């Protein structure tokens, strides 16, 4: 437990450390953590693509369900994290422990729900995209393993957030890193040595998650004295569960919107492009590669949000505005780097997925076209973090909903159908740039509203 003096020192850092240095200090561990998560996202696809392109399609079609699972895990954990941090700040250890216990209980319930989906819904989900039997069979095997052993990812994320809620983020980096390394080592073993293909990739993934979960439990028991979980007398609390989801549901919905978008985008690509399943592979490769650009920006957001929130509470207007400006600039730097890489090196990037000449024919122009969207994406993600800092997550949800469902899917459908009629698959990829531009306009309008109502009325100060 930190002493009162240490708490004051930590608070002073948020209010007095030079903003640029503070952003780097707060965000760098989060950025590293997010890059590890991005590695998790890509490694299965890289190894599976070495088997054949149909196997890559099977994994790509599984992604929306897999992503939704992670969304439920992280969304629930976000609520638990926030409530525990608040309870500990109030010196209410009993409440913090009960919230943690209810969080673990919800992780168990969620894993049971996805287990049932894996057993009974996997084949139906994959077959709703394609009629190719090999892809249906392989995709079903992949989802059944990932969902069947989903307790690994649910408990891993929950116990990692328990560590984060007490400020022990270093241990979460260890658990994620160990899980990712195990996954990378075991993927080629199960896929090629044991000749298990796509199913082997899924087994390697869940083993990595389970090991990370066990490690996270160990760190909580031995390195996290602020929380003491005791399930002998545990009873679920409707009040605590309601509080958890009141905070966590917006995060879950944000991910759910992304999963719905990916599901329909896959259906559009198969139905209305000449490349069909190969177009899905290009889209899947883009999604995995994109995470290496977007995940660091999300990590930046995770570091920036408490800085803005603290200085808003302290009414330090100058520091708030400087933090917002720098976060947008840094996010755009990441995005511009991504745009350059996607535009200049599409063949190299697709090579990670063992791209065939036909996939390169579709993928090279696709990545070049999509690279334009990065110019808008960075600022959009950064402003999403700003909205959360002021408790205005609804603005982030509006922007995300408009981008992914109101603009992207309808425009992709129109461009894909028109492109099919003239024999041009490239048009569909412009839907991303159009959607990101629209989302940026919405985010800017929302920020102007927020600035006028919340930031502008604050009295000017002379602090750095």
Question: Where in this protein do the model-derived segments appear?
Answer:
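Short alpha-helical transmembrane segments in multi-pass integral membrane proteins
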Residues: 1-27, 84-151, 195-249, 308-373, ...
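N-terminal transmembrane alpha-helices
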Residues: 14-46, 50-51, 67-79, 83, ...
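Interfacial/gating helices of multi-pass transporter permease domains
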Residues: 25, 47-67, 134-138, 198, ...
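Transmembrane helical elements of multi-pass membrane transporters/channels
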Residues: 25-44, 145, 156, 179, ...
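Helix-terminus/linker motif at the lipid-water interface of multi-pass membrane proteins
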Residues: 35, 39-57, 126-133, 189-196, ...
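Small-residue-rich hydrophobic transmembrane alpha-helices
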Residues: 56-116, 153-172, 282-344, 377-399, ...
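Hydrophobic transmembrane alpha-helices of multi-pass small-molecule transporters
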Residues: 68-71, 183-187, 213-217, 292-295, ...
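Short runs within selected transmembrane alpha-helices of multi-pass transporters and secretion channels
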Residues: 77, 145-164, 172-180, 201-214, ...
